[in-house]
UniProtKB/Swiss-Prot annotation:
It is found in: Cytoplasm. Residues 153-175 are annotated as: Disordered. It comes from Danio rerio (Zebrafish). This is Tudor domain-containing protein 7A. CDD domains: LOTUS_1_TDRD7, LOTUS_2_TDRD7, LOTUS_3_TDRD7, Tudor_TDRD7_rpt1, Tudor_TDRD7_rpt2, Tudor_TDRD7_rpt3. It comes from the Eukaryota.
Length: 1079
């Protein structure tokens, strides 16, 4: 913790825990109680602690007390300049200069840790030049990767060799610059994922390879990824495949197919269909639907080895999985293929514990109807579907049972879907994905195009939808929720438009001044001179004697202009796509022209810069808009649905009124309770929900499966066996989400397959009913605590939650319409002294200082022994085992990484880029598990591993220390962040979540040595690496006693730019040299 940023953060936490300040003489002790270390002020170039504190006035404010003692107070932490002023400037700006106001990005939503859209992705391009001579890249080639990155992550381009390649496997020789002479290049070793150097082959070699390829494809008769063929070829024949680029030309041997999905750049290879005996089934027309039994009709040649190939993952497959399983094809490129060569003798072989027998059980083949239904489900759930959810989905969606034996042997689905095991320790948890050739999308209705078709106009490239899930937009006009005109902000969009419009202004004010357009035609593209001198691209829509109605193609509005302002639009100004585009608002389709919705959108969205979450990427994207200009995110869709509610269905609340027949539906951890009051809305809600129950019982719900979850969506979920209204409030990856039962005030976590759409015939009526759960606070118990003691929460739940009708008296309604009440058991208001409030206040566990007890209980654990060094890390005392150590490449080798935290070049945290999707699945499972658990008291011990709830996600953390106010300092073992949380947010980390290695790797930048990093250098470093995928070349590894103590030294390379490698250590060296010259 020698880093100045971490020290500042911990100092601020210590000082904020005391309103009356901390004496400087006591500050070191309080800091050590939190972090286990002293404040290292000498490392930052200060002789005394007071000198260091005075150098950081933004963190510490020093004052002298009446007695003369120096007191330390928390300094004012000023936030960055708010963008609200900029938003206000944009309110009514339409015509000119808009692009200049859009060159910023809206604050990303803090609730999204990672993208929930998980798509296949290639590994990062490896840099063409290494740092040290003789060291080569041995990074494996992963043909598909589940990408998970933060909202502002740039899209990494494909490797440079893929742009003009004929084969998915590269032919590339990496070179290394010498330290003495950069022009001396040495060829590197080839990696397992790249092709070897080209060597001449004769006709006999080609025929031999073709025969072997034919044998390989007989084994994978349902298809195999082209990028996996060299690996499979080597494992079968113990030879390298040097002419993989020729495979596509061997049409008599195989068929190569490009998948229908734009997200997959690999190709599927199928064997050429040969004539089969007459007794065989009807020939399969589509390779994608080929039966796996077809391969059994083809006898292997004598030269073929009996090889069994199994799908598995490389980490700790448990021994309790000897289930029969055949190869799953097409082989998923992100799965590791482990080959076991068996003897051809008939005697029984003892298989590896991780390897199930290859002979499937004698089950009847799956029917075509069942396979088709499964394909329908997987098309509905394009991001994958957990296999364990199939029985319930089949029963509810199709009214039929799903065979249990298929779940025990998923290889039977080889020709129907792809199977992936993201949790290496659990072979029963599999995700099914539709085959690329089977992807089917249902087209949505599109608004009319903004640009009139005109054959005489030159071609202008179409606007590319941003690849990130979140992007800043400027909302220009909303005619309906299905026709929202917006412009994208940032690089490649508003910035490029600004540059082009400046070039247009310079051109038409000089060379192009005489290019006036005397006879415009409808549909013609023109340049229009605005009143302030700007030149804008437009299209002619209507003509009159002296006026022309034009549509401004980059700014999305119509206007009448004089003929004298029209100019010919030159070709050099048609290379940039037109920036105004249309989108549709998700969740508001049934209310597309509702006056209430349009009025709400006018006030919340039109003329403002918002953050757009892209739910569906098409020519007209489906988006959710957020206003992130304030501290709290405002979901525009949710606000529009709220505006549709009929307020007359609410029970009017009045101070000093008594309400009977109250039902307490939820008790939160902060002591707030949700109550249902009798109202007209509650009676109508019960009537509609009864009809919905009958609808689901009488009809199949195939069309009502929720396939596109997003925050703010109102749908249905089951609570205690009955359907209830729910709003999606958070997403954890693509399979797990958080909801809020609107009429219960009860949050829950579940899988997306458990949600259902509201039947259309009930939708509009149901949306108008306000939420029936009212949030209330118990008067006299509003203590200064973010979280109540677990004992108090449990007592309150046992006393009033879902018990006999209660009674409440409202004593106050604050500005936020929060209701302060006295709650009574029974249906009559009694004396206040008999209220639940007073009963709880008199309980022993409420009166005692819970935080002090926690500290006293664990204080002995925080004090080091007499001879123990202050920096040592005692052994964790958890009885459960720790995960295995994360496997790293050898020194000098490369690995694809994602930088989750970057303090400065001396300390940052890496995550393995290829395994991020496993972490997302793990965290989703943790959300499902812990959010369903009751609040329990945990014996918190320093240097132990726990599960912690941080920002609505569950993390694996290491406890570093406790503060006297009940806050706990924890270190996120997968992300490398330090956080302060309430002690009640900690739970034991069960064995199931200890299988995946901790993903956070502490690192420092190689070849850059400096003891103390200035803030300017740290900011430069963060801007280049934080929240970005990079290639790391390992320079050294410093092992530790525990996984979180390991630290590596790496070179970082940014390969996201086209044909350019950016070495981060060179940037930092140049920056340090520049600072030295200035000094």
């Amino acid at each position: 913790m020698s880093d100045v940023e971490l020290v500042k953060k911990m100092l601020r936490a210590v000082l904020q825990s005391s309103k009356h300040g901390v004496a400087m003489a006591r500050l070191q002790g309080d800091y050590r109680a939190l972090t286990g270390e002293m404040i290292p002020f000498r490392k930052f170039g200060h002789d005394t602690l007071e000198s260091f504190l005075r150098s950081i006035p933004g963190v510490v404010r020093l004052e002298r007390s009446i007695t003369g003692e120096v007191m330390c107070f928390a300094g004012v932490c000023e936030e960055t300049a708010h963008i609200a002023q900029l938003v206000a400037r944009q309110k009514n700006v339409k015509k000119t200069g808009c692009s200049k106001l859009l060159n910023f990005q809206m604050r990303a939503r803090t609730s999204h840790l990672f993208s929930h859209n998980v798509k296949p992705r290639l590994s990062l391009r490896q840099p063409s030049n290494m740092t040290h001579p003789g060291r080569g890249s041995v990074t494996s080639f992963y043909s598909t990767q589940r990408k998970l990155y933060s909202n502002d992550l740039p899209s990494s381009r494909a490797p440079a060799w893929q742009m003009n390649r004929k084969s998915p496997v590269p032919e590339k020789t990496s070179v290394v610059p010498s330290k003495i002479n950069t022009n001396i290049k040495t060829p590197l070793k080839k990696t397992s994922g790249t092709a070897a150097q080209q060597k001449p082959v004769n006709r006999a070699d080609v025929e031999l390879v073709q025969g072997r390829i034919k044998q390989l494809l007989q084994k994978y008769s349902s298809g195999v990824w082209l990028s996996k063929i060299p690996q499979l070829y080597k494992s079968m024949f113990q030879e390298e495949l040097h002419i993989i680029q020729e495979v596509e030309k061997w049409t008599h041997i195989c068929t190569v197919e490009k998948p229908g999905s734009n997200n997959i750049v690999d190709r599927l290879v199928y064997p050429v269909l040969e004539p089969v005996p007459k007794a065989s089934p009807v020939p399969v027309k589509s390779p994608c639907k080929q039966s796996p039994n077809t391969a059994l009709l083809k006898q292997p040649t004598l030269t073929q080895k009996t090889t069994r190939t199994f799908r598995t993952l490389a980490i700790n497959i448990p021994q309790s999985t000897p289930k029969p399983q055949t190869p799953l094809s097409p082989t998923s490129p992100n799965s590791t293929m482990i080959d076991f060569t068996l003897s051809e003798t008939p005697k029984t072989q003892s298989l590896s514990p991780i390897t199930p027998p290859s002979t499937p059980p004698a089950h009847q083949p799956l029917t075509t109807e069942l396979k088709q239904k499964l394909r329908q489900l997987l098309n509905k759930y394009s991001q994958g579907l957990w296999a364990h959810g199939l029985p319930q989905l089949f029963q509810e969606a199709f009214g039929c049972a799903f065979p249990q034996y298929v779940l025990e042997d998923l290889s039977l689905l080889a020709d129907t879907c792809m199977v992936e095991y993201p949790m290496p320790d659990n072979r029963k948890r599999a995700i099914l994905y539709t085959l690329p050739c089977q992807v089917q999308t249902q087209p949505r209705s599109r608004p009319p195009p903004l640009v009139l078709p005109c054959t005489s106009n030159p071609h202008v490239p179409p606007l590319i939808i941003p690849t990130a899930d979140f992007h800043s937009v400027f909302v220009i006009e909303i005619n309906s929720t299905n026709n929202v005109v917006v412009r994208f902000a940032g690089g490649g969009y508003s910035k490029s438009l600004e540059v082009m419009e400046e070039e247009m202004q310079n051109f038409y004010n000089n060379i192009g001044a005489g290019l006036c357009l005397l006879s415009p035609k409808i549909g013609q593209l023109v340049a229009v001179a605005s009143s302030d001198g700007a030149m804008l691209r437009a299209q002619v829509h209507q003509l009159s004697e002296d006026k022309v109605k034009v549509y401004f193609l980059d700014h999305g509005f119509f206007d009448l202009v004089s003929r004298k302002t029209l100019f010919q639009l030159r070709d050099q100004f048609m290379t940039l796509p037109f920036q105004a585009t249309t989108c549709q608002l998700a969740g508001l389709e049934p209310f597309s022209t509702d006056p209430v919705v349009l009025k709400t959108l006018q006030s919340l969205a039109v003329g403002r810069s918002l953050l757009a979450e892209i739910v569906e990427r098409e020519d007209t994207p489906l988006v959710v808009l957020y206003d992130t200009s304030e501290n709290d995110d405002v979901n525009v869709t949710a606000m529009c649905l709220k505006a549709l509610q009929d307020k007359s269905m609410e029970n009017p609340l009045q101070v000093n009124s008594v309400y009977t027949n109250v039902c307490v539906t939820n008790v939160c951890s902060d002591g707030s309770v949700y109550c249902q009051l009798p109202s007209r809305g509650q009676a109508k809600l019960k009537d509609i929900m009864d009809k919905i129950e009958a609808h689901f019982i009488s009809q199949l719900t195939w069309e009502l499966l929720v396939s596109r979850p997003f925050c703010g969506k109102v749908c249905l979920a089951k609570y205690k066996g009955k359907w209830a209204r729910a709003e999606i409030i958070n997403l954890h990856g693509s399979h797990v989400l958080d909801i809020l039962f609107l009429d219960l005030g009860l949050p829950a976590s579940l899988e997306v397959s458990e949600l259902r759409e509201i039947p259309p015939i009930f939708l509009k009526e149901l949306i108008t009913i306000p939420p029936q759960a009212i949030k209330c606070l118990l008067e006299d118990l509003n203590v200064d605590r973010a979280v109540w003691p677990p004992e108090a929460v449990l007592w309150l739940r046992e006393t009033v939650h879902n018990k006999a009708p209660s009674c409440m008296k409202i004593v106050k309604l604050d500005e936020t319409r929060t209701v302060h009440i006295y709650l009574f058991c029974g249906n009559e208001a009694q004396d206040i002294h008999d209220s639940v409030n007073r009963q709880l206040a008199s309980c022993p566990f409420w009166k005692q200082d819970v935080y002090a007890n926690k500290i006293n209980k664990a204080s002995e654990l925080f004090l080091p022994d007499a001879g123990e060094p202050s920096g040592s890390s005692p052994a964790p005392s958890n009885a459960l085992t720790l995960p295995p150590q994360l496997n790293l490449p050898l020194v000098g080798q490369n690995m694809d990484v994602f930088v989750s935290v970057a303090c400065h070049p001396g300390h940052f945290v890496l995550q393995p880029w290829q395994d991020l999707y496993k972490l997302v699945v793990l965290m989703g499972e943790m959300v499902l598990f812990y959010n369903k658990q009751e609040v329990t008291t945990v014996d918190i011990q320093k240097n132990n591993v726990y599960a912690a709830k941080i920002d609505n996600n569950w993390h694996r953390v290491l406890v570093k220390g406790l503060l006297t106010n009940g806050l706990v300092s924890v270190y996120e073992l997968d992300y490398g962040k330090y956080e302060l949380i309430n002690y009640t947010q900690l739970q034991p980390l069960i064995e199931e979540f200890r299988q995946l290695p901790f993903q956070g790797i502490s690192a420092q930048l190689a070849d850059v040595k400096k003891e103390v990093w200035c803030e300017e250098a740290s900011m430069v470093f963060r801007n280049h690496v934080e929240k970005k995928p990079l290639v790391a070349q390992i320079e050294s590894v410093e092992e530790g006693e525990w996984p979180w103590e390991r630290k590596i030294s790496v070179y970082l390379v940014d390969t996201t730019q086209e044909n350019k490698d950016i070495w981060i250590h060179n940037i930092m060296k140049e920056f340090l040299d520049e600072i030295s010259r200035d000094a």
